[in-house]
């Protein structure tokens, strides 16, 4: 579907706002962990699943979301996923114990995983090749700024409000996006029937879930933790073997045969791992061990968030002007 310039700008704004809200949500609970550990009487290893579980589900859902994009109309899929995010946020807002909160976080992650892939694919589809770097730079600004701003925003909010307000913020932000999409988002493409490899989805979810659960358990029960990690790796290996032999893989691992793609993938994984690890650990250390307030933690996290916001669009412009080698 051919869109005029004004429509493209409006659609891009809606997509970026949705992706930003989903990514902001990934680290929004980090600063709230000490408060929730106190309120629910739980350990750090259990509380961190509010963030780790969210990231895990996003990672597992993302490959499926590319197929969902092809199978359903863009408008229906976007409204469904943003609606799911709002419903999950409402569940977290009214919850009064840990397990409904965790369920809300995991449902938010399902919606976020779909929204993030949807936004990237749709942006590339409506963008001309000569503006690709700039648009991807804006998307990367959202990808990096969302998780970076999350702890800052939650730190400020928790200075005056309870952790319930974090879910309330998610409801309000995504409700605005949903309303804007109802009136402005066209069907960029028609739906078409394709098969989805659900067994591969289950293998990846079980494998990564067991591996991460093993890491969380190994300190308290070493034998159980190591066993879970080994079992998780076996499921992941089974998943990888299935992808190599499948004609329509859920995740096309054959791309890793390319040396450049392989190196860049490893680099992005390491960089994002360090980024998320730092975003998770620093608030817990400052609040639980150094006795700092949520607002003080927010101030510590602020410079990194600002740097991300500034650097990402500049990188996209440099890519358009000078190419990949300069970057």
Model-derived features with residue positions:
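MFS-fold secondary transporters
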Residues: 88-93, 108, 124, 181
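Helix-loop junctions at membrane interfaces in 12-TM secondary transporters
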Residues: 94-105, 162
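C-terminal membrane-cytosol helix-exit motif in multi-pass small-molecule transporters
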Residues: 171-190, 205-217, 231-246
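12-transmembrane solute porter fold
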Residues: 7-34, 40-66, 70, 75-78, ...
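Short, Lys/Arg-rich, polar N-terminal cytosolic tail immediately upstream
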Residues: 1-5
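Cytoplasmic helix-loop-helix junction between adjacent transmembrane helices
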Residues: 106-141
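Membrane-interface helix caps and helix-loop-helix hairpins in membrane proteins
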Residues: 98, 189-194, 215-222
């Amino acid at each position: 579907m051919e869109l005029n310039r004004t429509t493209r700008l409006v659609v891009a704004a809606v997509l970026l706002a949705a992706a930003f809200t989903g990514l902001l949500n990934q680290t929004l609970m980090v600063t709230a962990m000490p408060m929730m550990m106190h309120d629910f009487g739980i350990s750090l290893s259990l509380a961190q699943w509010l963030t780790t579980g969210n990231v895990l589900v996003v990672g597992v859902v993302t490959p499926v979301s590319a197929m969902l994009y092809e199978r359903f109309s863009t408008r229906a899929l976007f409204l469904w996923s943003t609606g799911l995010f709002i419903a999950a946020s409402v569940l977290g807002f009214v919850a009064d114990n840990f397990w409904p909160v965790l369920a809300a976080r995991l449902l938010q992650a399902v919606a976020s995983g779909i929204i993030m892939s949807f936004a990237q694919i749709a942006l590339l589809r409506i963008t001309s090749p000569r503006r690709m770097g700039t648009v991807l730079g804006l998307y990367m600004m959202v990808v990096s700024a969302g998780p970076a701003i999350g702890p800052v925003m939650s730190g400020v909010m928790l200075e005056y409000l309870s952790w319930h307000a974090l879910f309330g913020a998610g409801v309000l932000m995504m409700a605005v996006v949903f309303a804007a999409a109802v009136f402005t988002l066209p069907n960029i493409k028609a739906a078409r029937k394709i098969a989805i490899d659900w067994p591969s989805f289950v293998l990846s979810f079980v494998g990564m879930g067991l591996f991460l659960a093993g890491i969380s358990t190994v300190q308290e029960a070493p034998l159980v933790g190591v066993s879970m990690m080994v079992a998780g790796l076996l499921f992941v290996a089974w998943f990888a073997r299935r992808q190599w032999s499948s004609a329509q893989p859920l995740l096309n691992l054959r791309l890793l045969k390319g040396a450049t793609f392989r190196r860049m993938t490893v680099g992005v994984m390491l960089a994002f791992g360090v980024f998320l690890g730092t975003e998770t650990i620093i608030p817990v250390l400052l609040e639980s061990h150094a006795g700092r307030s949520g607002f003080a933690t927010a101030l510590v996290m602020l410079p990194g968030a600002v740097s991300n916001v500034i650097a990402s669009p500049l990188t996209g412009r440099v890519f358009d002007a000078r190419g990949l080698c300069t970057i």
